[in-house]
UniProtKB/Swiss-Prot annotation:
Residues 1-35 form the Rubredoxin-like domain. Its cofactor is Fe(3+). The keyword NAD applies. Functions as the terminal component of an NADH peroxidase (NADH:H(2)O(2) oxidoreductase) when using NADH:rubredoxin oxidoreductase (NROR) as the electron transport intermediary from NADH to revRbr 2. Plays an important role in the oxidative stress defense system in C.acetobutylicum, an obligate anaerobic bacterium. Also exhibits NADH oxidase (NADH:O(2) oxidoreductase) activity in vitro, which is 100-fold lesser than that of FprA1/2 using the same electron transfer components. Therefore, its predominant function is most likely as a scavenger of its preferred substrate, H(2)O(2). This is Reverse rubrerythrin-2. It comes from Clostridium acetobutylicum (strain ATCC 824 / DSM 792 / JCM 1419 / IAM 19013 / LMG 5710 / NBRC 13948 / NRRL B-527 / VKM B-1787 / 2291 / W). Fe cation 1 binds at C6, C9, C22, C25. GO terms for biological process: cellular response to alkaline pH; cellular response to cold; cellular response to heat; cellular response to hydrogen peroxide; cellular response to oxygen levels; cellular response to salt stress; hydrogen peroxide catabolic process. It comes from the Bacteria. Signal peptide: none annotated.
Amino acid sequence: MKKFKCVVCGYIYTGEDAPEKCPVCGAGKDKFVEVKDEGEGWADEHKIGIAKGVDKEVLEGLRANFTGECTEVGMYLAMARQADREGYPEVAEAYKRIAFEEAEHASKFAELLGEVVVADTKTNLQMRVDAEKGACEGKKELATLAKKLNYDAIHDTVHEMCKDEARHGSAFRGLLNRYFK
């Protein structure tokens, strides 16, 4: 038995010859092609790092946009917190929604660049475990310095973020161990 695919709607038919008419979309026999490879290939998909080797100005623009989008995420979330403090919850929610959209933009620039993400989940998890450990240590040092200089509010905020980084790293390590070790 052979398999035939309707190129209009994707319907797969199994038989000796393509059907006269697609039972799903009604396309004629001429719209069927024989399926030769049964692999899981897709017609197209997103690829990480497609900007490698592009024009220097384009590459710099992609990097600048990635940084800008990341900055906007933090800025908009901070603005959302301020709007909440002032009693404007709808404004806060708009900032949060837009921050998420900016995060999506940043993720697309990250994928194009392929510098902070690779096409391998195990490697990405390990990179994040290592990065969160470094971020935790860096924030702990900053919090300790702020405490030493009697900047209590800065110490408290940064120290709490230090603990968040440890939690993030532990979550990533748990996933790494569960799926890859």
